[in-house]
Swiss-Prot record:
Residues 118-358 form the Radical SAM core domain. The active site is at E112 (proton acceptor), C363 (s-methylcysteine intermediate). GO terms for molecular function: 4 iron, 4 sulfur cluster binding; metal ion binding; rRNA (adenine(2503)-C2-)-methyltransferase activity; rRNA binding; tRNA (adenine(37)-C2)-methyltransferase activity; tRNA binding. Its cofactor is [4Fe-4S] cluster. Gene3D superfamilies: 1.10.150.530, Aldolase class I (3.20.20.70). One of its GO terms (cellular component) is cytoplasm. The gene is rlmN. It comes from the Bacteria. It comes from Salinispora arenicola (strain CNS-205). NCBIfam families: rRNA_mod_RlmN. This is Probable dual-specificity RNA methyltransferase RlmN. Keywords: 4Fe-4S, Cytoplasm, Disulfide bond, Iron, Iron-sulfur, Metal-binding, Methyltransferase, rRNA processing, S-adenosyl-L-methionine, Transferase, tRNA processing.
Length: 380
C-alpha cells in the first residue's frame, strides 16, 4: 500500500453557520409542543392530536389531519409541521427490499436515508449531518466535507417518512413496521451530539411523544470521538455503539480514519469497553474490507488479539467503492480468511449484507451523483 498524506481533522471547528430550519414538533418534547400550542391560542390537547398523527399514524401532511378544525390546522402547520425534507430522488433495488431517498433541505443541502427490509425486521439508516468533517479517504461523504449539522427534527423526519414506507407494505418480504434505526448515514453522529441524542429520545419515546422504538434497536456509529462516547455512556440510554475502526494499528488508522491522529486505537477501544461495561451493550466493531490495504492476515490476527474476551462483535463491510476511487473491496477468499482468523481468536464476526449497490447505496454516493448533475463534474 502506498502511504497517504495524513489528513488533519479540526474537531474544534463548528459546522458552517447555515440558517437552521424552522422549528418542528419533533424538535420539542410533548410538554414543549403543548406550550407552543397554548401560545397560538389553541387548547393544549391539540399538541397531542398532532403528535398522534405524526408519530402514531406517520402522517407528515397536515392536510390529512381532518379531525383538526381548518383554522387550527393552518396555524399548527406553520408552527409545528413545516416542510423539512423535500424529495429529490427515490430509488428501489434488491427486489424491493431496499429503498433509498435523497432529500433537499431548506438551504439546498442534500442528505440521504435508506430503508432496508429483512424477513424479521425493517431498518432505517439515517443521516445526522449534511456532509461529514471526518475526512475518511475511502468514504464519499467524508470526501465531500461538512456542510452543517442537521436539526433534531430533520433527523427524526427521515425516520417517520421511512416508517411510513414500511407501514405501506412497500418493503418486499418484510414486516410492515420500522423496528430498528442505525445512525450510519451521512455525517459523524457524535459530532452533532445534542441533536442526535434528542432525536434518539424522540425515536424511543412512546407515541404520541415519539416513535416508540426500543432503545436496544438503535445503533449509533462513530469514528471514535472519545469524550462524546463517554458522554453517551452517561445518558441512561441502552443504545448500541458501533465503532468504525477499519484498522487495528495506528499507522494505518491514522490514514484511513484521520481522527485517530488525536485518539489512538488503544484509547478508542478502552473507551468502547467502558461504554460496554456501563450499558451492558455489546460494541459493534465496523471494519471496511479494502483490498490490499487493511485485509492482511496479520491485521486480522492483531484485531483478534485486541478484541478477544471483550463484549464486542466484528461487522466486516465489503467496501462499496465510490466512482473514480482507487479503493476496491477485498476478494471473497481474502474476506473469508479474515473471518476465519477472527473466529479462531474467539471473536464473534459476521460480514454485512451488501445493499443498494445498484442505486449508489453507500453513504454519500447518491448525493454526490446528484451534486455532479446539478453543478457539473469537477465543480467546487
Amino acid at each position: 500500500m502506498t502511504s497517504l498524506p495524513l489528513t488533519p481533522v479540526n474537531l474544534d471547528a463548528p459546522a458552517r453557520r447555515a440558517a437552521m430550519p424552522p422549528r418542528h414538533l419533533a424538535d420539542l418534547d410533548l410538554a414543549g409542543r403543548q406550550a407552543l400550542v397554548a401560545e397560538l391560542g389553541e387548547p393544549r390537547f391539540r399538541a397531542r392530536q398532532v403528535s398522534t398523527h405524526y408519530f402514531g399514524r406517520l402522517v407528515r401532511d397536515s392536510g390529512q389531519m381532518t379531525d383538526l378544525p381548518a383554522a387550527a390546522r393552518e396555524k399548527l402547520t406553520d408552527r409545528l409541521l413545516p416542510t423539512l425534507l423535500t424529495p429529490v430522488r427515490e430509488l428501489t433495488c434488491d427486489d424491493g427490499a431496499t429503498h433509498k431517498a435523497l432529500w433537499r433541505l431548506h438551504d439546498g443541502s442534500l442528505v440521504e436515508s435508506v430503508l432496508m427490509g429483512y424477513p424479521d425486521r425493517v431498518t432505517a439508516c439515517l443521516s445526522s449531518q449534511a456532509g461529514c468533517g471526518m475526512a475518511c479517504p475511502f468514504c464519499a461523504t467524508g470526501q465531500a466535507g461538512l456542510t452543517r449539522n442537521l436539526s433534531t427534527a430533520e433527523i427524526v423526519d427521515q425516520a417517520v417518512y421511512l416508517a411510513g414506507v414500511a407501514a405501506s407494505g412497500a418493503v418486499a418480504g418484510s414486516p410492515p413496521r420500522l423496528s430498528r434505526v442505525v445512525f450510519m448515514g451521512m455525517g459523524e453522529p457524535l459530532a452533532n451530539y445534542n441533536r442526535v441524542v434528542a432525536a434518539i429520545r424522540r425515536l424511543v419515546a412512546p407515541a404520541p411523544e415519539g416513535l416508540g422504538l426500543s432503545q436496544r434497536h438503535v445503533t449509533v456509529s462513530t469514528v471514535g470521538l472519545v469524550p462524546a462516547i463517554r458522554r453517551l455512556a452517561s445518558e441512561d440510554l441502552s443504545v448500541t455503539l458501533a465503532l468504525s475502526l477499519h484498522a487495528p494499528d495506528d499507522g494505518l488508522r491514522d490514514e484511513l480514519v484521520p481522527v485517530n491522529q488525536r485518539w489512538k486505537v488503544s484509547e478508542v477501544l478502552e473507551t468502547a469497553w467502558e461504554y460496554a461495561a456501563r450499558t451492558g451493550r455489546r460494541v459493534s466493531i465496523e471494519y471496511a474490507m479494502i483490498k490490499d490495504v487493511n485485509d492482511q492476515p496479520w491485521r486480522a490476527d492483531l484485531l483478534g488479539r485486541l478484541l478477544a474476551g471483550k463484549l464486542a462483535h466484528v461487522n466486516l463491510i465489503p467496501l462499496n467503492p465510490t466512482p473514480g476511487s482507487r479503493w476496491d473491496a477485498s476478494p471473497k477468499p481474502v474476506e473469508r480468511e479474515f473471518v476465519r482468523r477472527l473466529r479462531d481468536a474467539g471473536v464473534s464476526t459476521t460480514v454485512r449484507d451488501t445493499r443498494g449497490r445498484e442505486i449508489d447505496g453507500a453513504c454519500g454516493q447518491l448525493a454526490a451523483a446528484e451534486g455532479d448533475e446539478i453543478v457539473g463534474p469537477g465543480a467546487p
